[in-house]
């Protein structure tokens, strides 16, 4: 789905240069990039700059993976809001981090508050799953660069809403 929205919202827009600065130049040969990924795997530093190993294969895949994760994040936050789920945990420095039950991820202009809600919620969900002997519901670590890319996706979507 991310590929479709890249064509619709980024390809011919004034954001394509910002996209290239953040994700890389999508004009690089796509098939060659995928062949290289399947032959050699992801670069060693993929975790510093991409949301998944596959995202490191080509800028289009980086966008598509980021877009998919963005949908996971806002959909999960919306579901938790619908059910009134709230979380709160004390951090090592004594600060309290929590997710509010009435948070509207679609209504915020900046992506920062979304991550602020997402982090404690996924920590709680992953902890519950582990308590039940299951794998994490969201086993991904979001690097600062990945969060920046998710923020870009958020802005593109907000700027193009109807």
Residue ranges and their predicted role:
Residues 32-45, 96-97:
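Active-site-adjacent bridging/hinge elements
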Residues 7-38:
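Post-HEXXH active-site segment of zinc metalloproteases
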Residues 1-11, 64:
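Active-site recognition of the HExxH zinc-binding catalytic motif
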Residues 51:
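Long C-terminal interaction/binding lobes of large macromolecular proteins
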Residues 54-162:
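Pan-zinc metallopeptidase signature
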